[in-house]
């Protein structure tokens, strides 16, 4: 899907799963990318050392970018630069985010997460990142999105101009609840990559639901 064909409604952000086998992970991401519209892919570090994390990023970034999917690397600017990623996803305090934005915004996208309440989110938002993420990597282990993430996403989407991403649950149908908040993006991981699932079919199904249920945004929103 080209930029001119991007849908004007809530879109999918993939969170790469915690899988140690690079070949298997590459196959899963490639299959998901074939399933339909995906806006971006976030690569969490999952506690890996620098060498292992960089190898994973080197494996996945070209696959995603070949399908027009922007790739965000969690926290490590050196790895992001080495592998030609599109941006950094930062989980931390406002001062760290401000420093990151000062150094890299303009060259890379800078997104953030980790807010547990409205005050946290507003403090991080003052740094003007490219997006706010509500949720935690690896915690999409229930069918529905976490109520706190839905609440924060709905409040943010209504009150703040910066785009937000809300973590969905481990069932595809949960994208509807996220889209209903007005969030610009819905994050999916276990719903796509669970053992036995077809990532392409799951992405296609999620896009069908979003196309049918998600509100349309006005131009410029």
Q: Can you say where each PLM-predicted feature lies in the sequence?
A:
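Short capping loops/turns at secondary-structure boundaries
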Residues: 114-117, 146-149, 168
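Flexible, active-site-adjacent loop/turn segments at secondary-structure boundaries
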Residues: 135, 190-191
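Flexible, gly/pro- and Lys/Arg-enriched active-site loops
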Residues: 92-98, 136-159
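Conserved N-terminal beta1-alpha1 strand-loop-helix module at the mouth
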Residues: 1-89, 94, 103-130, 161-162, ...
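Internal alpha/beta core interface subdomains
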Residues: 183-185
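Glycine-rich anion-binding loop/nest that anchors nucleotide
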Residues: 133, 164-170, 187
């Amino acid at each position: 899907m080209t930029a001119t064909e991007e849908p004007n409604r809530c879109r999918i952000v993939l969170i790469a799963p915690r899988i140690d086998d690079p070949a298997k992970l590459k196959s899963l991401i490639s299959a998901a990318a074939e399933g339909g519209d995906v806006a971006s892919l976030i690569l969490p570090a999952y506690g890996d050392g620098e060498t292992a994390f960089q190898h994973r990023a080197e494996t996945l970034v070209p696959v995603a970018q070949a399908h027009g999917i922007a790739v965000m690397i969690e926290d490590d600017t050196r790895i992001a630069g080495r592998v030609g990623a599109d941006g950094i996803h930062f989980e931390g305090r406002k001062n760290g985010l401000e420093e990151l934005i000062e150094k890299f915004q303009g060259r890379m996208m800078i997104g953030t997460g980790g807010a547990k309440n409205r005050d946290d989110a507003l403090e991080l938002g003052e740094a003007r990142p490219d997006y706010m993420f509500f949720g935690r990597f690896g915690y999409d282990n229930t069918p529905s999105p976490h109520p706190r993430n839905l609440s924060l996403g709905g409040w943010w989407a209504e009150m703040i101009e910066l785009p937000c991403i809300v973590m969905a649950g481990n069932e595809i149908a949960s994208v509807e609840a996220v889209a209903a908040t007005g969030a610009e993006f819905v994050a999916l991981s276990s719903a796509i990559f669970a053992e036995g699932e077809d990532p392409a079919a799951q992405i296609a199904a999620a896009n069908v639901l979003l196309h049918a249920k998600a509100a349309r945004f006005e131009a410029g929103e």
